[in-house]
Design a protein with these regions (language model features):
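Membrane-embedded alpha-helical bundles that constitute the cytochrome b-like, heme-associated redox core
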Residues: 1-141
Length: 141
């Protein structure tokens, strides 16, 4: 059971990462080209939000089922266990919170520039935090 959930978490990560990168690039392009914020731009950001939240939910299941997750919290001297039991989940949760804040803030804004700027900042920071603690070794096994 654990292996299936772990593979789902790893596989979905590629899709969630791709959509999030598209959303960040789209927001920077919109900001710097001074284009109007359209329904297409909103949907790109929404799909990134939904994809990354789905990844979070799958990650919670993995965290509590995995021998490398919650049960390994007492072994902070081991860098690999610390990454999977503390650093990866914590930084990803913070990154996803920033992405969620960006989504919530954009709804109150009225100008295209402010919406693109908000997505660029919050989604961009969220992406940076997520990228900082991905266990890259397991991505390319």
């Amino acid at each position: 059971m654990y292996e299936i959930i772990q593979k789902l978490h790893s596989g979905w990560a590629y899709l969630a990462f791709l959509v999030l990168v598209i959303a960040v690039v789209n927001s920077f392009v919109g900001l710097f080209s001074k284009k109007d914020f359209t329904e297409r731009d909103r949907k790109i950001a929404l799909f990134a939000l939904a994809g990354i939240h789905t990844q979070l939910l799958i990650g919670f299941v993995v965290y509590f089922v995995s021998p490398l997750g919650f049960s390994a919290l007492g072994q902070m001297k081991d860098a690999a266990l610390r990454l999977t039991s503390l650093e990866h989940p914590l930084m990803n949760i913070i990154g996803i919170v920033l992405i969620t804040i960006g989504w919530m803030k954009h709804k109150k804004l009225t100008t295209s520039e402010s919406k693109f700027k908000t997505f660029s900042i919050y989604y961009g920071l969220g992406l940076a935090l997520i990228l900082s603690k991905i266990p890259w070794g397991s991505w390319f096994d």
